[in-house]
Amino acid sequence: MTPITPQEALQRTIEHREIFHDEMLHLMRMIMSGELSPVMTAAITTGLRVKKETIGEITAAAQVMREFSHKVQVHDTKHLVDIVGTGGDGANTFNISTCATFVIAAAGAKVSKHGGRSVSSKSGSADAMEALGVHINLQPAQIAQCIGDVGIGFMFAPNHHPAMKNVAPVRKELGVRTIFNILGPLTNPAGAPNILMGVFHEDLVGIQVRALQRLGAEHALVVYGRDGLDEISLGAGTLVGELKDGAVREYEIHPEDFGLRMAGTRALRVENPTESKAMLMGVLQGDEGPARDIVCLNAGAALYAANVADSLEDGLRRAQQALASGAALAKLQQLVAYTQKLAA
């Protein structure tokens, strides 16, 4: 079969027709290798966005991004989980998932956290980790050591996806969301089989969870807060797409289901990484309120995804215990010391 040409692919998007799996693999390899011109890369990614990317197109693109990535080899992945968001929710909340990372590890799961610098928020996960004193530029083997010994490994996305340099200028100049915004969370370099993923639009809940299903994930929760948050929200109901035992089901959860008080995002907003760090540290040091509640809720969901907890309720209880005991704060201190020692 003759490979699809970029011009044919562009025409498909204009006609709102799907680019099939093998064609998308070929096209994505051209993009990631720098073979495709910036003009065609921009045209095709914009065309895909306008027609709306299909599960098949997203799955194929994620497979190629994984092919081109620098991987972290983790041998025991039974309770390995990633907690990640697509970003783009515009809520400017503090680093909820980064804070939850320490709670999750303290409660017995292992976290391979995959993230970058700020895209739409005031503070990205890499910005937050750096502000806390974590060394984020480690080699893949060192990150694997961190996961094994501390229970947390932070993978700074640009270090693991060098081929993205071929796309970065196009993405920056376009300034609109493209397929790459939803590929990052699907391409964990440590191959975490379990994931809690927040998305920026309700349509993506069903799409991303089915892409994860096709990509071989084991236990996944894809969530969208009805108030627009790409986390499990305290301010509204949260749509959930869950992949478990090979099957997908979709449902909605509410804070009061877990005995938590509803709270809007205003109390969680920050203006810069300094404010985000202060709120994050407050949670780890025992401050009560909406920030603590939303961290526990999301950490609890990740513990359920990691198969450490039997249910969301059990996960929440374990997360609350990890914070109350001081174990989550100790986990942060352990990670800082360990990464600084490795980087020395």
Swiss-Prot record:
Q: Where, in this chain's numbering, is anthranilate 1 bound?
A: 85
Q: Name one GO cellular component term.
A: cytosol
Sites binding Mg(2+) 1 sit at 97, 231
Please give the name of this protein: Anthranilate phosphoribosyltransferase
Single GO molecular function: magnesium ion binding
Listed under GO biological process in this entry are: L-tryptophan biosynthetic process
Amino acids binding 5-phospho-alpha-D-ribose 1-diphosphate: 85, 88-89, 93, 95-98, 113-121, 125
Q: Which gene encodes it?
A: trpD
Q: How does it assemble?
A: Homodimer.
Task: List the pathway annotation.
Answer: Amino-acid biosynthesis; L-tryptophan biosynthesis; L-tryptophan from chorismate: step 2/5
UniProt binding sites for anthranilate 2? 171
